[in-house]
Amino acid sequence: QGKETAIFTGDTLFIGDVGRPDLAIKADLTERDLAGLMFESLRNKIMPLPDDVIVYPAHGAGSACGKKMSKETFDTLGNQKKTNYALQAVTKEQFIDQLLDGIMPAPQYFAKNAKLNKEGYGSFDLVLETGVVPLAPKDLEEMVNV
C-alpha cells in the first residue's frame, strides 16, 4: 500500500545508539569523515520516515559496536527520535564530537571478521567437517595450560 512500516537498519541505527564510524575506515576517509556520513544518513534517510516505523537493527547490546546499545531488539522510530542521543537536534560537528567521544578501541577480532564478511568462507558442511575435532582430555588440558 506504499506505507513505510519497518526499517532494517543494520549497524547504522541501533536501539539507543548508532554504529561506530571507526570500524570501516578506508584509506581516503577518516573516522570523522565517516561520522559525518553517518550524520547525513541518519538525517536524510532514516529520520524523515514516519514515527510509527518499527526499527529493526542488526543486533543489540553485548557487542562493541556501540556505546549505549539497548537490550531491546526493536522500537519505533518516534521513540528513538526522543530517546537516542544520536538522533537529537545537534549540528553535524556536535554529532561527530559526541559519536567519537569515548569510543573504545576496535575489538581484536574485528579485522578477521571483516575480512571473512567481505571475502566469504567455506560451506557450513566444510566448517563442521574440519572444525569439529574430538579432543582427548589430556590434549585439552595441554591447550589450556599453554
What are these regions (language model features)?
Residues 82-83, 87-146:
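Flexible, polar/low-complexity N-terminal or interdomain linker segments that lie immediately upstream
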